[in-house]
Amino acid sequence: MKFKRILFLIFIILFFGGQLTLASGLSSNTASAPDASHLSLDEVLKKIEKHYSVSGFTAYFTQTSTIKAMDITDSASGKAFFKRSGKMRWEYETPDRQIIITDGNTLWVFRPEDNQVMIGKAPSFFQGGKGFSFLSDMKEIREKFSITLEKETEEGFFILKLLPIEKTLDIVKIYLWISRNTFDVVKILTYNSYGDETRIVFTNIQLKQELDDSLFSFKTSEGMEVLNLDEQQGQ
């Protein structure tokens, strides 16, 4: 049961889904925001890319995911770290501690409570924009998605609609909420072909010139249970 629980949480983040709904309480500091209503899609994308041109960033996150067929909703929160290219670290604090790490080549999922780590090949889990991989390099948005700027938008935000160029059951549609003031990606909503929904809201976003590479690697220790994630994925 524990192993199934771990896989459930992995697929929530890596094979996510979501729908276009607005989170209450989402703030963009619009009082001091410049008038950006005239910007074209290309101009918005260029500003996002420029804003995230530093090597990495950190943020706190809250995540709500729903598996429609099972009528299950799961919520989680923690802190995330992103670094070009392809490096990510998601530290889940609630409801259970677990850490999802990738250096772009290898994926580690560690549960401290069970002293257990699952190891797999990162590309098979992150290809085609899965697993929020574009957050480690915002230029991937142009490369992996067909993008439109939504006409109906929430005050203080641009809303981008992303359709994967490479069709997959795991991702059908993604929406990004972009602050008109800072050009931070403050919210992500996704859904898959099964109608499953995932919402991620970022707060306290901190752009970093440098994040230590040790954050994006993992070393096993004596006595730790090691499982092959690629084998489990193929079953």
Model regions: which residues?
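Bacterial N-terminal signal peptides
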Residues: 9-19
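An acidic-aromatic
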Residues: 79-129, 198-199
